[in-house]
Amino acid sequence: RDPEMSRGLGDVYKRQIVGSNGAGKSTLFNAITGGFIADEGSILLGGQDITFAPEHQRSKVIGHLFQDPLKGTAPNMTIEENLALAYLRAGTAPNAIFSRISRKDKALFREKLALLDMGLEDRMKQPVGLLSGGQRQALTLLMATLVTPKLLLLDEHTAALDPATAEKVLALTKSIVAEKKITCLMVTHNMHQALELGNRTLMMDAGRIVFDVKGAARSKMTVDDLLEKFRENAGKNLDNDRILLSKVEK
C-alpha cells in the first residue's frame, strides 16, 4: 500500500523490514517475486515494469533466500549441479552446462565456494542433502548472487540457524552485498539488525508501511525509539515475542 516501495527500490543499497506476524512482509516479497499478481499499483525494478511478468522471468533478476535453509537448494543434486542450476536460472549459460559442467565453470564454482570458508570447494561432488543447515543457506546465498541480481530478498534467512552459524552467514551476506553493490531488502525480527544493517528501516503493520527512517535520523535511533515510533504510527504496541526478545540481544 505504499507507492514509495515501488518507486524507490533502484536507488537503495539495503533496507531492513520489521513487523509482527501477519504484517505483510512475506506477502510483499511474494508480490515482488511474482508469487501472485498485486490487486493494484505497479512494481518497477530498474525502471522496468514487472507487475505482470511471470515468476520464472523475475527469478532471472531477483535472488530470494528463505528462513528455511532447505528451500533454496535441490538436496539430491550435487553442490556443483546446484551452482550450475543457478547459472541456468539466471539465463547466462547454455542448457548444456547442466549435462556437462566445463572445467572453466568448475574452477569458477570452486573459487566462489572457497570464499565461504566452509570447505565446500572440496565437496563439490557431494549431494547438497548431506550439508548442514548453515552450509546450505550459505550455498543458497552464493547461488542467488553467482550472477549479480538486480534485487536480493532476504526473508529472515538466518533465523533458523544457531547463533554462531547465523553470525557467519550474516557476515557473508554483508560481504557479498557490499562487494557486488546489490540492492537488497531484508526482513528481520532482530531490532538491533534493523537499525545497524543497511541504510534504511521500514516498519510494517496490516499490509502497510507505518514508519520509514533513513539517514541521520536513523543513525541516532535506539531500539526503544523504533518501538515508540511504531506505537505512535500504528496505534498499538509491537508485541511480537521474537522482536521484543531481540531488544536485549545483540
Annotated model-derived regions:
Residues 41-49, 211-213:
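Conserved ABC transporter NBD signature motif
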Residues 218-250:
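ABC ATPase nucleotide-binding domains
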Residues 144-145:
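ABC ATPase C-loop
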Residues 33:
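Helix-to-loop junction immediately C-terminal to a conserved catalytic motif
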Residues 2-13:
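Single conserved hydrophobic/aromatic residue that forms the stacking wall/gate
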Residues 18-20:
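The feature captures the beta-strand-to-loop junction immediately N-terminal to the Walker
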Residues 49-63, 71, 75, 95-102, ...:
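ABC ATPase NBD coupling module
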Residues 188-189:
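H-loop/switch region of ABC-family ATPase nucleotide-binding domains
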